[in-house]
Amino acid sequence: MRPRKDILVSGCFIVVTSLLVMAIWWAWRQYVTDPPYVDPEQFPVRGIDVSSHNGMMNLDAAARDGVEFIWIKASEGADFRDANFALNYQKAQHAGLKTGAYHFFRFNRGGVEQALNLLRVVSGRRLELGIAVDVEEHGNPRTDSVLQRLQTMTEYLNLRGYRVTFYTNKDGYAKYLSEYFRGFPMWICSFTDDSVGDDWAFWQYDHHAKVKGIQGDVDMNAFCGSREQWDSLWRRPVPGVAYPLRPEK
């Protein structure tokens, strides 16, 4: 017969192990969430967003797989530049994808210095989708400071002919953008529903999509408009920078 102490230790080990397995499963479910159903009739135009983390890509194959547009990471903060931007941009243009560049906004750096960092990467390039500023909550910055820096960066880009789209999730939208940046096209990350807002231009609905020509997972997005609205954008003159992409409702 096993000693009572050994039985208690074994029982505690089983309980702790079970709790640990449950915690890991719960955390995994929070991270790997089944994407919402995206009605292809309501959202017929799909695209991806990429960075150097996606590695080497065959964007011609991605285009044949139904991808029609791409957002490419260009820069972050005041001094980081994505090492693969130039190559990814070249591949996107060769594949015929409508292309935009995005900048990850750092709350602790000034708006002008971040705009300058971005422009050093994208200047002279044709960007049909224009520029997106990625606003994601991190740290605990003062809201008024964030808004001031965002406004400074946006105005700096606007004065140089660039129309800005904002990327964020619903929390970031409510905290920073909904009141102070009305009228700007929004690119919203949401994995829960398709309740598209009136100012949504793009909807990121999946972080784990599979696309031919890309190894591993890739972010998938939908244009928040009809096929006709999408096609009508490209009948306008494209100046090499951006113009409003939010579809008319």
Walk through the language-model features, giving the residues of each.
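N-terminal Lys/Arg-rich, disordered targeting/topogenic segments
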Residues: 1-7
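Hydrophobic membrane-insertion alpha-helices, especially the h-region
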Residues: 9-29
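Substrate-binding cleft of extracellular glycoside hydrolase catalytic domains
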Residues: 30-35, 40-63, 74-154, 158-163
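Functionally critical loop-and-helix segments that line ligand-binding/catalytic clefts
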Residues: 35-55, 181-249
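Short beta-strand/turn micro-motifs composed of small residues
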Residues: 103, 168, 190
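Structural recognition of alpha->loop->beta junctions
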Residues: 119-133, 176-199
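Aromatic-lined carbohydrate-recognition surfaces of secreted/lumenal glycan-active proteins
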Residues: 161-174
